Amino acid sequence: MMDDSLRVSILSEALPYIQRFSGRKIVVKYGGSIMEDEKLKEAFFRDIALLSSVGVCPVVIHGGGPEINRWLNKLEISPKFENGLRVTDEKTMEIVEMVLMGRVNKQIVRGINKTGSLAVGISGLDGNLIQSRELGDGSHGLVGEVTQINPELLDPLIAKGYIPVISSIGSTADGISHNINADFVAGEVAAAINAEKLILLTDTPGILKEGDNPNSLVKQINLKDARKFIEKNIVSNGMLPKTECCIRALAQGVKAAHIIDGRIEHSLLLEIFTNSGIGTMINA
């Protein structure tokens, strides 16, 4: 049981951060194991609600890979991946849209709203929020990359205190839908709305200097050194695209990007409101 003096100490430590980030926008990518664990999900919803209640303006971006796989299997469609990307034909894209927009998005909205905060679920199709094009040579089918974010839809929602919850689907000018990596969507949205922070919830502690050794966690790094980590292959495999999207967001004006372990309960608050943080912060 936490004693009163410890509670006061925690609140005292959080106060300057609450004052600093009140009125600022923070984009959070929600994904990984946290989406599969009821206790972690509930903690995340409360964390987002708390951020909103102290004046921070959170925006949530989500994917939903495991749920997509479940529905593909139910419909006897085998999920296919190449180089870590889902091969998305037209039939698969229909399932992706159904699951992300109609199921996962609304589950998140419902969870946040139950806390007393007001979330609004939208996709990248709404108001042409996320414009996209086919990724690379098209070998992955309807997998896309962001070409433009139109923040006009988000600005009035944020100004009125709503919490936008955005599924990572974009479309071309011709209305062709694309399945887009949620990390990169989060980075581009953060840049487009001039966010103070981009935070990626992952299944790792953050950037590690030594393979999978959690004791080698890099707590803080600047943009220049983050690029060097990539050049030296210190950052590789699944951490590579996450670090790249952070770098791109910082290069477009986001003040700081964080890669944190979503498997730790209340990791979002621990990263934002404590002196030591819990993951890796990349500064511009």
UniProtKB/Swiss-Prot annotation:
Pathway connected to this protein: Amino-acid biosynthesis; L-arginine biosynthesis; N(2)-acetyl-L-ornithine from L-glutamate: step 2/4
Keyword Lyase in record: no
Catalytic reactions on record: N-acetyl-L-glutamate + ATP = N-acetyl-L-glutamyl 5-phosphate + ADP
Localization of this protein: Cytoplasm
Gene Ontology biological-process annotations: arginine biosynthetic process via ornithine; L-arginine biosynthetic process
Transmembrane domains' residue ranges: none
Top enzyme category: transferase
Coiled-coil boundaries: none
Binding site for substrate: G64, G65, R86, N179
InterPro entries: AceGlu_kinase-like_sf, AcgluKinase_fam, ArgB, Asp/Glu/Uridylate_kinase, NAGK-C
Keywords: Amino-acid biosynthesis, Arginine biosynthesis, ATP-binding, Cytoplasm, Kinase, Nucleotide-binding, Transferase
The name this protein goes by in its record: Acetylglutamate kinase
Organism from which the protein derives: Prochlorococcus marinus subsp. pastoris (strain CCMP1986 / NIES-2087 / MED4)
This protein's encoding gene: argB
